[in-house]
């Protein structure tokens, strides 16, 4: 597995180091970069939202179970749960920001 990963990274480095002088080729490359940016933004945000939803569900389930076992700790558990939910949601918002950057301010597109 390490050899395959090393080979993939080596090929990627060569591909990024290659320069092109033809504007037509660069425009075609920009189209592919835009297409894959849309795909990456959608998949990345979808996975982040799915992971966040699973994490929030587990957090709420654990808080409800803890409150059911010891009702006196309910307010403290709720406070901790809300802090945890904010941290989980922050990760999804970070993924959204990265997706928006990839869509609207893509640093990989070469302007002519």
From Swiss-Prot:
F(1)F(0) ATP synthase produces ATP from ADP in the presence of a proton or sodium gradient. F-type ATPases consist of two structural domains, F(1) containing the extramembraneous catalytic core and F(0) containing the membrane proton channel, linked together by a central stalk and a peripheral stalk. During catalysis, ATP synthesis in the catalytic domain of F(1) is coupled via a rotary mechanism of the central stalk subunits to proton translocation. Belongs to the ATPase C chain family. It comes from the Bacteria. This is ATP synthase subunit c. It holds the Pfam family ATP-synt_C. It is found in: Cell inner membrane. It is a multi-pass membrane protein. It comes from Campylobacter jejuni subsp. jejuni serotype O:6 (strain 81116 / NCTC 11828). The chain crosses the membrane at residues 36-56, 81-101. The keyword ATP-binding does not apply. Keywords: ATP synthesis, Cell inner membrane, Cell membrane, CF(0), Hydrogen ion transport, Ion transport, Lipid-binding, Membrane, Transmembrane, Transmembrane helix, Transport. The lineage of its organism: Bacteria, Pseudomonadati, Campylobacterota, Epsilonproteobacteria, Campylobacterales. The record marks 89 as: Reversibly protonated during proton transport. One of its GO terms (molecular function) is lipid binding. The keyword Zinc does not apply. GO terms for cellular component: plasma membrane; proton-transporting ATP synthase complex; proton-transporting two-sector ATPase complex, proton-transporting domain. The gene is atpE. F-type ATPases have 2 components, F(1) - the catalytic core - and F(0) - the membrane proton channel. F(1) has five subunits: alpha(3), beta(3), gamma(1), delta(1), epsilon(1). F(0) has three main subunits: a(1), b(2) and c(10-14). The alpha and beta chains form an alternating ring which encloses part of the gamma chain. F(1) is attached to F(0) by a central stalk formed by the gamma and epsilon chains, while a peripheral stalk is formed by the delta and b chains.
């Amino acid at each position: 597995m390490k050899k395959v990963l090393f080979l993939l990274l080596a090929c990627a480095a060569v591909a990024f180091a290659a320069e092109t002088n033809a504007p037509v080729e660069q425009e075609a490359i920009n189209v592919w970069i835009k297409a894959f940016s849309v795909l990456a933004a959608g998949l990345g945000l979808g996975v982040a939202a799915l992971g966040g939803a699973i994490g929030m569900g587990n957090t709420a389930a654990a808080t409800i179970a803890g409150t059911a076992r010891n009702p006196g700790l309910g307010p403290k558990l709720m406070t901790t749960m809300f802090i945890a939910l904010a941290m989980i949601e922050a990760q999804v918002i970070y993924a959204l920001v990265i997706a928006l950057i990839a869509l609207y301010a893509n640093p990989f597109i070469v302007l002519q």
